Each structure stands twice: as C-alpha cells, then as structure tokens.
From Swiss-Prot:
A cellular component annotation (GO) from this entry: small ribosomal subunit
Annotated family: Belongs to the universal ribosomal protein uS14 family.
Origin organism lineage: Bacteria, Pseudomonadati, Chlorobiota, Chlorobiia, Chlorobiales
Name of the protein this chain belongs to: Small ribosomal subunit protein uS14
Gene Ontology biological-process annotations: translation
Organism (species): Chlorobium phaeobacteroides (strain BS1)
NCBIfam families assigned to the protein according to its UniProt record, in alphabetical order: PRK08881.1
Assembly description: Part of the 30S ribosomal subunit. Contacts proteins S3 and S10.
Function statement: Binds 16S rRNA, required for the assembly of 30S particles and may also be responsible for determining the conformation of the 16S rRNA at the A site.
UniProt keywords, alphabetically: Ribonucleoprotein, Ribosomal protein, RNA-binding, rRNA-binding
GO molecular function: rRNA binding; structural constituent of ribosome
Any matching Pfam family: Ribosomal_S14
Highest rank taxon of the organism: Bacteria
Amino acid sequence: MAKKSVIARNEKRKALVEKYAAKRDQLKKAGDYEALSKLPRDSASCRVRTRCVLTGRGRGVYEKFGLCRQMFRKLALEGKLPGIKKASW
C-alpha cells in the first residue's frame, strides 16, 4: 500500500491538470512558451502517475484495468474480473 500522502499528492496533480488543460492547449497553439512556463509545474500531464485504484501502487499498473499486476492476478483468479481467465495451452 502506497503512503496516503503520495496518493493525495497525485490526486492534487490530477486536479491541476484538469483545471489548466484548456489554458495549456490554448498557449501551446499560440506558441506562447513563456506564459506556458509560468503555469504551475504540477499542471503538466506528465507529472501525474498512473496508480492502482486499490493499493495506490505506482509500478506495474495495467492502465486498461487501473490495477497493479498483483491485484489483477488476485482478482482474476478469484473470478472477479469479467471476461478474464487464466490462459492454458
């Protein structure tokens, strides 16, 4: 489980990205890089980390499911992910 402060910081960054998305696109199209650099750093989408929705883990996350590899495996084996089954051949 990731620290709550790390998860909260990432949520704050997501909110800033959403807040400044339109302004950022407008400045990029205009080519006003000086004004773009004056926006908050955390409003850039590259600062947001994809995290597991259950544990907050930041590595090994499947974006399609929003789960880290451990939780994905656990839930898939329990049959809680519809349409997912273990491969065998």
